[in-house]
């Protein structure tokens, strides 16, 4: 009858000898029909970066994504999951070529921010946030397209105290995204192309962000570019040198340009399914010369990574 149930656990050992869990989930459903999944995992990828790609700017999971002064590359990840301070419940359904998904993430909302700081204010967590993240996707042969949104539906979940001691809510976060993909690698493993075009927009408390990215994979080599724009309308500038000629009416405008690349070396030591992935990126944050918030010591970032993978 196609019914199934199961669980998945992905242990993760770090260099200090500690053992953690990357994903841990229980699921059940009906084959190619519907599924319910609960635990720690990632929902539908609305900003795919293609082959095993290394990009580290402010963060790369549901936690520590945002850091004041470093710029924010918004990728529809906030409600996707794999949080260290909460868990997911996801419902999904297939209807022919159409796929529906609703992911719910409940977590400590301040875990999104490094150092629990947002726009120069220390955040006070009042209650857990609950992100709702519906996705609708359509796939036909090599082409697919998906649209989604993610929104925290809990008001006054976290915020800060102003100079009069009043609580100021900062937990408004509404994101929207669309991604299109072409993937004919299954039909043509040697010369197939995997290409992605993605956009995302975030309307948050005192801030709006826009991101667009494109990447292409061909013959084991991947190359991509990401553009991000941040418009921060509110920022606590206490302690920041003031300029009477600039009233800080737009205290944080950033443009971020990122180029990333990846290359796969297959069958290491002639062992089938044992591959090496080499990844690198460079990212440049641009801000106006009179910007008081941009972190000048971190306006350029770059990194490289070598990852070995064995597929069982």
Residue ranges of predicted features:
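Detector for outer-membrane/organellar transmembrane beta-barrel domains
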Residues: 133-264
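Transmembrane beta-strands of outer-membrane beta-barrel proteins
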Residues: 6-10, 39-41, 101-105, 146-150, ...
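Short loop/turn motifs that connect adjacent beta-strands in outer-membrane beta-barrel proteins
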Residues: 1-6, 29-36, 97, 138-142, ...
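Outer-membrane beta-barrel proteins
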Residues: 16, 47-50, 61-62, 100, ...
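Outer membrane beta-barrel
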Residues: 1-107, 128, 137-141
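Outer-membrane beta-barrel "beta-signal"
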Residues: 265, 299-312
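Loop-centered beta-sheet repeat module
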Residues: 101-159
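Residues that define the transmembrane beta-barrel architecture of outer-membrane proteins
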Residues: 18-24, 83-87, 94-96, 128-132, ...
